[in-house]
A protein has these predicted regions:
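Beta-strand segments within the central parallel beta-sheet cores of soluble alpha/beta enzyme folds
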Residues: 93-96, 140-143, 231, 285-286, ...
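Iron-sulfur cluster-binding cysteine motifs and their immediate structural context
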Residues: 179-181, 212-236, 263-290
Length: 348
């Protein structure tokens, strides 16, 4: 930014010269608003696109850390080395250079016996690197969660941590507010309740449940969003494969009928917002087809084969309904339709 166009042009020229001296081969500054938005969309898509490139069946892990900006270059090198050292070779690093802030994403399959132990060792090494060697921040931009809570004291020191705990206890003596998320005495909390993303459907297996799709969904906040439909589908498949809790699986299957299947518009607007184009609506249509019985399939086949006759009958039926409304009082019509809905279990 600059106070005027002339100053901005001068600053851009200086930046181009500086970048050129350091080996940059493609430098493109633009003041075109549409182009700027397009470039920002690419940047915003790093998170989901990186997650979609992970091996199927693995969970995506992401954190954001920071170091003094004057040490950013060596910090990037050390972060890359740390990720590689612990076997996270597919990890990507991006962030906000002006703040010395790095985001990194990696993946692991926590159904494997050694995955949690490897993540434990990595997390301790990450804490030592960031808060020890670089005197930086383990949570540079986003909030502390259980993956970092075990290392808050190492970053801030025992005295500051004690003050935090005392303030927390003063305002929340029963530990009801966000329990164990910011402050947690369990040194292994970061490797407990690790999330898995089991294979459920090829249409959704690359979803990282980022939620970018949710604002576009007509049923969001009414029943379930696309992200929630995917999460429930994964949990149902996990329970089905493991045989862990048949009663819970039965309840999920039953409840999903309305919340997941019946209220999905199957419009696939979610895929427009999704950085990798996941079509939750197509998945739902597939699940609907699986739940249809032989009778429903027979009716659907008949309608498809006799579309013209069915449309004629429907037009006739609507005509009869119009005539009936002129003869039968409105309260009686309402009573008839209510009775039909009750008898048909709300299918009519």
């Amino acid at each position: 930014t600059a106070p005027d166009a002339a100053t901005l042009e001068d600053e851009v020229a200086k930046a181009i010269a500086l970048l050129s001296r350091h080996g940059a081969t493609h430098i493109d500054f633009s003041t075109d608003e549409a182009r700027s938005h397009a470039l920002w969309d690419i940047r915003k898509g790093f998170f989901a696109s990186g997650g979609a490139a992970r091996p199927k069946g693995t969970a995506m892990l992401t954190e954001d850390v920071a170091a003094p900006i004057e040490r950013l270059a060596e910090f990037v090198i050390d972060m890359r080395a740390l990720l590689d050292e612990h076997g996270y070779h597919d990890a990507i690093i991006f962030g906000h250079a002006l703040a010395g802030n790095l985001h990194f994403q990696m993946s692991d399959d926590f159904s494997l016996p050694d995955a949690a132990a490897r993540f434990d060792v990595f997390s301790k090494a990450l804490s030592d690197l960031v808060s020890g060697q670089y005197k930086g921040s383990l949570k540079a931009e986003h909030g502390t969660g259980r993956a970092i809570a075990a290392f808050v004291e190492a970053e801030w020191g025992a005295k500051a941590y004690g003050l935090m705990a005392a303030i927390k206890s003063l305002f929340d003596p029963e530990g009801l507010l966000n329990p164990g998320v910011l402050l947690n005495a369990d040194p292994k909390i970061h490797i407990k309740h690790l999330k898995s993303l089991p294979l459920a459907d090829e249409l959704i297996d690359m979803c990282i449940e980022c939620g970018f799709c949710e604002p576009a969904c007509p049923s969001h906040q009414m029943t379930l969003s696309p992200r929630q439909r995917i999460a429930v589908t994964r949990e149902r498949e996990r329970l089905r494969a493991s045989g862990e809790d048949p009663e819970r699986l039965r309840r999920l299957d039953d409840d999903f009928q309305y919340a997941g299947l019946d209220t999905c518009a199957a419009c696939n607007l979610c895929s427009v917002r999704c950085p990798v184009g996941i079509e939750t609506g197509t998945m739902i249509m597939g699940q609907r087809a699986q739940r249809r019985g032989d009778g429903a399939r027979a009716v659907a086949g008949f309608v498809a084969d006799h579309r013209g006759s069915v449309e004629t009958l429907m037009r006739a039926g609507l005509g009869v309904a119009d005539v009936a409304r002129t003869v039968i009082p409105a309260p009686a019509v309402a009573a008839i339709t209510d009775t039909a809905r009750r008898i048909s279990s709300k299918r009519l």
